[in-house]
Swiss-Prot record:
One of its GO terms (biological process) is vacuolar transport. The keyword Ubl conjugation does not apply. This is Vacuolar protein sorting-associated protein 60.2. One of its GO terms (cellular component) is multivesicular body membrane. It comes from Arabidopsis thaliana (Mouse-ear cress). Keywords: Coiled coil, Endosome, Membrane, Protein transport, Transport. It is found in: Endosome, Multivesicular body membrane. Residues 99-148 form a coiled coil. Belongs to the SNF7 family. It is a peripheral membrane protein. Gene3D superfamilies: 6.10.250.1710. The gene is VPS60-2. It holds the Pfam family Snf7. The keyword Membrane applies. Residues 1-30, 174-235 are annotated as: Disordered.
Length: 235
């Protein structure tokens, strides 16, 4: 059947905007190279015209320079036209990319909208309000429990301002009595070491010689006690 009717030709895909823009830019660059080459020739002719004396030779150089200038103008026109086409293609490409971005944005928004609707079905405002109310009740109960546990025992609640002022005056008087001696409260004064003699209730040692009766001198030993006569020790 293919031999009779022929095979169907596969159509090539149309060129994209980027392909067309690249091809036109390539042509524009080629034309730009030609313009630069003609500029170099014109510079040579300019130098020749300066060095050549008036006459047929000068006219011939001017004619060639005029022909090169016409070619340059033609190539410049083609170059500008190609660059304008490239600019138009760039604008179209920018618009197409913007539409693609808009399509992707719309697709993402639709997907997000669908997902949010599914999530909102499981989350209700009334449930959130009820949960908040329950949390507030629990916090109030917790505060009451803490206050109950922190309540003091055997503390009178009927203390008024007069009682407070009387207590402060009594404290001030006590502190004044403690600081009268050395200007230091008793709780800041150093502790005194107890006297051993006071604790044992022993009599104090004699500080001097006891006076003997008149007319009789009594001998004493080295500790201040009456000396024992030696005769009594022998007997």
């Amino acid at each position: 059947m293919k031999r009779i009717f022929g095979a169907k030709n596969n159509k090539e895909p149309p060129p994209s905007i980027q392909d067309a823009s690249d091809r036109i830019n390539k042509r524009g660059d080629s034309v730009e190279e030609k313009v630069k080459r003609l500029d170099a020739e014109l510079c040579k002719y300019k130098d020749q015209i300066k060095r050549t004396r008036p006459g047929p030779a000068l006219e011939a150089i001017k004619a060639r320079a005029m022909r090169v200038l016409k070619q340059k103008k033609m190539y410049e026109g083609q170059r500008d036209m190609l660059y304008n086409q490239t600019f138009n293609l760039d604008q179209v490409s920018f618009a197409a990319e913007g539409l693609k971005d808009a399509q992707q944005t719309m697709t993402a928004l639709k997907s997000a909208n669908k997902e949010l609707k599914g999530m909102m079905k499981t989350v209700k405002i009334q449930d959130i309000d009820n949960l908040q109310d329950d949390m507030m009740d629990l916090m109030d109960e917790s505060s009451e429990i803490q206050e109950t546990l922190g309540r003091s025992y055997n503390v009178p609640d009927d203390i008024d301002e007069d009682d407070l002022l009387g207590e402060l005056d009594a404290l001030e008087a006590d502190m004044g009595n403690e600081t009268e001696a050395d200007g230091v409260p008793s709780y800041l004064q150093p502790d005194k070491e107890p006297d051993l003699n006071d604790e044992l209730n022993l009599p104090s040692a004699p500080m001097g010689h006891t006076g003997a009766p008149p007319g009789r001198a009594q001998a004493e030993d080295e500790w201040g006690l009456p000396a024992v006569p030696r005769a009594s020790l022998r007997g």
